[in-house]
Amino acid sequence: MPILKSYYQDVYRSPVVRLDGYSGRHALAASVLAYLDFGGATGTSKDGLAETMLAFAAERGTLTPGMPVVEASSGSFGAALAVSCATTGHPCILVVPSSLPIARRQRLQELGAKIVVSSNGSRKAMDRIAQQTAQRYNAYYTRYFSNDDNPEYHRRVTGPQILKAAGDAIDAVVIGVGSGGTVTGVAEYIKAWNSMIRIV
């Protein structure tokens, strides 16, 4: 196995696996394929996304060398962003709800993030604190839930990877929805290739 130059090198080569056992147990006529997007340092689907969002911002000049990065996230994107910031030389500040378990906070800190705790865990309240924090530290606020770089990553990476692996075999793509970035980017890419493919 070759030595990787960075942990991102394998993030962009997520495997697609045929689930023959699942299809057999449920007597399905169709094949079921699974896109396994967990090859990065945090073991989540957000590693490549976080790195790419920072790269896009740097290309535009909105993220400059050494500039702090802020996000309101206590989940997988926050963890991935902390690692991406650590590897690119950006301080990472994460706004998290007070309800977040201490162990989760400690993990984010171990990944290099500074934690700002919000007593109100609503998305609106955390976004407001993140905006204030970004202004205070002259930082770049990634705005994961509303940043167009989120679906753009999936147009450029996830959609093409799925299509390259499955090709003409795709009849439908089933996607879980969180921020909406994956389903938006993948759907737009795949529908442009074949408008008959169903997005579920």
Where are these regions (language model features)?
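PLP-dependent amino-acid enzyme catalytic core
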Residues: M1-V200
